[in-house]
Amino acid sequence: MDESRRQRPAGHVAANLSPQGARQRSFKDWLASYVHSNPHGASGRPSGPSLQDAAVSRSSHGSRHRSGLRERLRAGLSRWRMSRSSHRRASPETPGTAAKLNRPPLRRSQAALTAPPSSPSHILTLTRIRKLCSPVFAINPALHYTTLEIPGARSFGGSGGYGDVQLIREHKLAVKTIKEKEWFAVELIATLLVGECVLRAGRTHNIRGFIAPLGFSLQQRQIVFPAYDMDLGKYIGQLASLRTTNPSVSTALHQCFTELARAVVFLNTTCGISHLDIKCANILVMLRSDAVSLRRAVLADFSLVTLNSNSTIARGQFCLQEPDLKSPRMFGMPTALTTANFHTLVGHGYNQPPELLVKYLNNERAEFTNHRLKHDVGLAVDLYALGQTLLELVVSVYVAPSLGVPVTRFPGYQYFNNQLSPDFALALLAYRCVLHPALFVNSAETNTHGLAYDVPEGIRRHLRNPKIRRAFTDRCINYQHTHKAILSSVALPPELKPLLVLVSRLCHTNPCARHALS
């Protein structure tokens, strides 16, 4: 018989014995026996002499007796503690006497990230559906790490309103650290959702236009991504300084932005997720061997991601099994991901479509207050913003050098509070009515849903306030005086026409024309 598996009854006498055979006593039992065995009472009063002798003794030696009692109690308590600790230690010559814990250790060591992680095969797995439209997803535990211990030099990769990015170029990794704990949960869930959509889109539709995470740390509030060569803003500056006329550059641009447009449509329509923060700084690029042409471009930074009306997981939950916990850690769907926010939609105004700027000027915000974001709105906003980033490249790299004048995509910068103002919204709408007709392609391909560019009368017709209408008209007249003659002399090479057609469709004034890209 295997003696190691035998169990004693709960009331067995051996249950009160230590591994060394001595009976275990509580502190209360020990103190009682000590007091009874002491020749003096617990109060320090002698038991033998009379009350008069006791009074004399207290008056002459009370302090000595009290101090002596305290010392004996302190010494006895120390011996009792030592005996208790020795009882807990198993005898070295007795096999199998180590005390077994009835609970797991307080904390098991988790894995630190010491080597560059590989791309995961999956990020989320549907485990069950608790209620109608309340799925529970298990997060791939292989993505979780405690600390980042990958060797290599760190360099500054960028900073934003929600976090900072460090680059480990030796291993081609980018580590984003979120500043606030509350916002980290929002961005982590958004990143995991988009990452799972990216993996599925790559397998089923060969769409790879979004960056996918490689790992994350709850303790450090970090998310690890693959590093790219630079963002689109830096690439535009580099390309403008080269003044290249190589047709392969525009061809690669057209391919990459077409891929990005497909990714935006897939994310909004199939996954029910709108990015809402597409700009040059959030598009990462990788160059070919010539260090000029694009090899790949992906959308990054999911800080403002919002689930639109096509999503079926707005009430979803996420669980992560950690080594130091018996039950998995649960995450609910953050509210910031499920409700529309007009301030988020409008942003700074640089890349927002005209219909959204008109709603801002008319103060039409009811449809965006505590409501789900409509799919067609999210898709129209994302596609227009993508077209504006491509227009930024065309103006900076091709238009401005050909004119010899620093023409920009928008009329100017905001200096007050870095927020959209009615004055700047009017300036944007009026400036586009002059810039877009000079660059957009006017053809049957782009005019299926009407003119691709904005005209003053079309904007003016939708403005409700007469004062705002007059201000808009004045702005249009001013920009026609200052820019129309210059822009009329723009002459771009014919190999740029596919790129301009794509800009015209992405930034079409009619949202339905943008939806037609899907």
From Swiss-Prot:
Subcellular location per the Swiss-Prot or TrEMBL entry: Virion tegument; Host nucleus
Nucleotide-binding recorded as keyword: yes
Result, substituting D164E: In strain: Nonneuroinvasive mutant HF10
Location of the region described as Disordered in the Swiss-Prot/TrEMBL record: 1-119
Superkingdom classification of source: Viruses
Post-translational modification (record): Autophosphorylated.
InterPro entries membership: Kinase-like_dom_sf, Prot_kinase_dom, Ser/Thr_kinase_AS
Catalytic residues as annotated in Swiss-Prot or TrEMBL: D277 (proton acceptor)
Catalytic reaction equation(s): L-seryl-[protein] + ATP = O-phospho-L-seryl-[protein] + ADP + H(+); L-threonyl-[protein] + ATP = O-phospho-L-threonyl-[protein] + ADP + H(+)
Example of a GO biological process term: symbiont-mediated suppression of host PKR/eIFalpha signaling
Outcome of mutating D53N: In strain: Nonneuroinvasive mutant HF10
Consequence when changing D376E: In strain: Nonneuroinvasive mutant HF10
A cellular component term, taken from the record's GO annotations: host cell nucleus
Name of protein: Serine/threonine-protein kinase UL13
The organism of origin for this protein: Human herpesvirus 1 (strain 17) (HHV-1)
Upper classification of the organism: Viruses, Duplodnaviria, Heunggongvirae, Peploviricota, Herviviricetes
